[in-house]
Amino acid sequence: MRVLFYVFPFVIFALSQAQLISVHVIFRHGARAPVLNVTSEEAKSYFYRGLGQLTDVCIEQAKLIGKVLKDRYVNTFVDARMLPTQLLFRSSPVERCLMTIQTVGNTMFVNSTPPVQTVAKPDDFLLVPKLDCAFQIDEWTNFFNLTENDKKQAKKNPWFISEKALRRATAASQTLQQRSDENLPALILEKDAGLAVPSWFNEEAYKESLTVFYKALAVMSSVGEYKSSKGIRVKTGLLLDKILNDIQEKVRCHEKNQKGHISCDRHKLQVFSTHDLLILPFLDALGIREAALGEDLPPKFLSAIIIETMLLDDIPFVKVFYRGDPRDITLRDMTGLVRNCPPNQALCPVNLFTSCCGEFITADPRRECYEEKADQQLHNWTMTTVSWILIGISAFLLIILIIMSYLAVRYKNRSVVTIKKVCLEN
């Protein structure tokens, strides 16, 4: 106890002397309406923006995390005048993610809104979890013994598999066993919003529904009992790869910048707005999913992961924080729980942190996701090229053969004429 008494002030003092060089913030969008349906007219009126869209509560949630980030980083780390070169605000193209990050940015910088970058959904492998990868059908077949008809449905609509996982988890629940036909995801959101729900959906049923709902998310995000390293890699591997490379690049820049001749400020604060299906595998890759969320629980709205990189006596370290509740103004320090980081330590050396997640990193998730299609396209292209080459060679040889045949016939005819001429002269 006495050791802790002396060590703790030392850690606080050391951190106060540290130079922050980069920050990455990854959060789930704020509170939204159910995606598929609501269960009452009251709910329909409450979620007036439409299915899957943000609620008014989300706006307040986004403002709160914006204030948390402003108090922590604006003025002390980035310029309060909002210099776009210092920032990267990147969002999934889905409206709820875009609206969330825009509100966060508006709160952080009062006079100017940071530009938000995004790309079309089919091309976004950074923040949109891919669910239509060919290999996933094989994994799901192993989990659920899919029939050929099931496979066809899963290819058309991957959420068909999520429904299977939801029903399996519901059937295994003593509380919800008879409720497999109920719209549990909608009831969870409606209860959270303070709306009227059926009497059977009491606190016990609500808590059990969170676990059941997590199981439906787990199969789609490749974690928990449905864990797949390749599945995690195609969903969150590119974001991990980007963040780890960014951290290493910032460290190298500051090592070169001992005399202050170059600037290392570009994109030193990066903020990403995404989905629960990416937050889950991201936490799993870091090795902190259960520590952050609890056992078999989904991430809440506007839950956030914050990764700070700093120099302490010119030595680079990382700290990892998690914000689990949309009402939280404090951050939980998860640094000592991250894979490869020294346990129970306040700081993680950069070289250990950046080696945390090798099996979950990819620079080309498109290739891994659509591997068979890509190989098939490459195969088709190669075959077509070879075919044209063979046709060209054949045509060339045919022309040569025709020319040689013509010359042979001409030579033969000339020989015959010569012989006849000789015979006549004799």
Curated annotation (Swiss-Prot):
Active site as annotated: 29 (nucleophile), 276 (proton donor)
Annotated catalysed reactions: a phosphate monoester + H2O = an alcohol + phosphate
Record: glycosylation sites: 37, 145, 380
Subcellular location(s) per record: Membrane
Domain of life (superkingdom): Eukaryota
GO cellular component: membrane
Enzyme class (EC, first level): hydrolase
Extracellular side: 19-388
Signal sequence, renumbered to the chain: 1-18
GO MF terms held by the record: acid phosphatase activity; phosphatase activity
Bridged cysteine pairs (disulfide): 133-369
Keywords from the UniProt entry: Disulfide bond, Glycoprotein, Hydrolase, Membrane, Signal, Transmembrane, Transmembrane helix
UniProt-listed Enzyme Commission number(s): 3.1.3.2
Membrane topology: Single-pass type I membrane protein
Cytoplasmic side, ranges: 410-426
Pfam families: His_Phos_2
Residue intervals passing through the bilayer: 389-409
Protein family per UniProt: Belongs to the histidine acid phosphatase family.
Protein name, UniProt field: Putative acid phosphatase 1
Organism: Caenorhabditis briggsae
